[in-house]
Amino acid sequence: MAGPAFRAAAVRVRVPATSANLGPGFDALGLALGLYDDVVVRVADSGLHIDIAGEGSETLPRDEKHLLVRSLRTAFDLLGGQPRGLEIVCANRIPHGRGLGSSSAAICAGIVAARAVTIGGEARLDDAALLDLATEIEGHPDNVAACLLGGFTLSWMESGAARAIRMEPSDSIVPVVFVPGKPVLTQTARGLLPRSVPHVDAAANAGRAALLVEALTRRPELLLPATEDRLHQEYRAPAMPESTALVERLRGDGIPAVISGAGPTVMALADADTADKVEALAGTDWAANRLGLDQQGATVLPLATASDT
């Protein structure tokens, strides 16, 4: 069977940062944020060349070990074969190791770019297969679902396959993220979780997660009670005591705040009237950023021109 044909032109993919869990929605809920990585991929005659600017430019590998490249390769295998060479340019803005979905962004950028640069790629790898592949690489669907679909997502596993639905978050919600200077490895944060939790805590989280869907989509005034968690944030506190303290301080002031993903970033769900005040609470140990909500998810864009901003 003949391998795939590839486009001669480069493709540009933009992927959003994401925040998973959102308090009670452990490994299920995700929110796409208005902070983006851009990747340009072109099929070349031979070799592999990677240029990286921004986050991770001094630490990320520039060879087959790069998660983006591994994701490209995995997708190309499913699409029917590898190109002879690749040229990749990365403009990274999503902080690494901070709980904002940088690994999911790399995975989604890689598989979306592979499909886009392959002629007939969408017929060979449809959107459902794309989500399943991203989940297989990442290990859980919450971040990759939000990264691919945008908006507010609920994801789950069914008979070994990833599934997700996209919902429209209320446009009154203004996420404010507090990013600390030091990362926490996802493996470290996950390693602190117990094998079992009390039934009463599981029941409480089920109720709060259901409430959170209503709060994020239609009734943001319920976000403070809806973001309560008993399954993971307390157990992870030893790895990020400053983050835990900030969440408690913000919530004590009536501000819905959670650990973003596996941490250590803290995310507050403010509104237009309170976002500036919330952002000012960062202090010197945090980089506070007021972000929009991303509605598009992973997107193939025209190549940048001199007029792009």
From Swiss-Prot:
The keyword Kinase applies. This is Homoserine kinase. Its EC number is 2.7.1.39. The keyword Cytoplasm applies. The gene is thrB. Pfam families: GHMP_kinases_C, GHMP_kinases_N. Catalyzes the ATP-dependent phosphorylation of L-homoserine to L-homoserine phosphate. One of its GO terms (molecular function) is homoserine kinase activity. It comes from the Bacteria. SUPFAM superfamilies: GHMP Kinase, C-terminal domain, Ribosomal protein S5 domain 2-like. GO terms for cellular component: cytoplasm. Keywords: Amino-acid biosynthesis, ATP-binding, Cytoplasm, Kinase, Nucleotide-binding, Threonine biosynthesis, Transferase. Belongs to the GHMP kinase family. Homoserine kinase subfamily. Disulfide bonds: none annotated. It is found in: Cytoplasm. InterPro entries: GHMP_kinase_C_dom, GHMP_kinase_C_sf, GHMP_kinase_N_dom, GHMP_knse_ATP-bd_CS, Homoserine_kinase, Ribosomal_Su5_D2-typ_SF, Ribsml_uS5_D2-typ_fold_subgr. It is an enzyme of class 2 (transferase). ATP binds at residues 95-105. GO terms for biological process: threonine biosynthetic process. It catalyses: L-homoserine + ATP = O-phospho-L-homoserine + ADP + H(+). Pathway: Amino-acid biosynthesis; L-threonine biosynthesis; L-threonine from L-aspartate: step 4/5.
